[in-house]
A protein has these predicted regions:
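Acidic and generally charged, gly/proline-rich low-complexity regions
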Residues: 1-124
C-alpha cells in the first residue's frame, strides 16, 4: 500500500456522485509511521459530489484495531466508526487551514486523500 493509492484523479470524472472504497490494514498505518495501535482492519469510503466548480466530500470509516487495556495490560479489539465532510474549491494556491474547506490550485487535477483518511481513522 502506498499513499498514491489514495490519489483521486478528478479531472476525468463526470459531474455527479462518485464512490471510492478503501480496505485498510496495518500497512496503512505504516505509511505514516504510526505505531500506537496494531491490527487495523476496516473500510473507508469517500463519496464525492462533483459539480463544475465545487466538490463535496463525505468520508466514513468503520473497522477495528487492537489496543492495550490500561488495567489488564492485555490486547483487546476496539471497534471504530467515524465520519466527516469537507468541501473542495479552487483558488490561486493550496490552502487547508480551514478544516471544513480545502482550496486547490486551478492547475490541480488530483485529490490526495491519504492524510484525510489517516485522520479519520486515528481520531475515531
Amino acid at each position: 500500500m502506498k499513499t498514491k493509492d489514495f490519489n483521486i484523479l478528478f479531472s476525468g470524472l463526470s459531474v455527479g456522485t462518485h464512490h471510492f472504497d478503501f480496505e485498510l490494514n496495518d500497512t496503512f498505518f505504516e505509511l505514516f509511521g504510526y505505531t500506537d495501535y496494531t491490527g487495523l482492519q476496516g473500510n473507508a469510503r469517500m463519496t464525492m459530489l462533483k459539480s463544475e466548480t465545487v466538490f463535496d466530500l463525505d468520508f466514513t470509516f468503520k473497522g477495528s484495531i487492537q489496543a492495550l487495556c490500561d488495567i489488564m495490560n492485555e490486547l483487546f479489539t476496539q471497534e471504530l466508526e467515524n465520519s466527516f465532510s469537507i468541501q473542495v474549491k479552487f483558488g490561486e494556491e493550496y490552502n487547508d487551514e480551514n478544516e471544513e474547506l480545502l482550496i486547490l490550485p486551478h492547475s490541480e487535477h488530483t485529490l490526495k486523500i491519504a492524510q484525510n483518511i489517516y485522520e479519520l481513522v486515528v481520531l475515531s
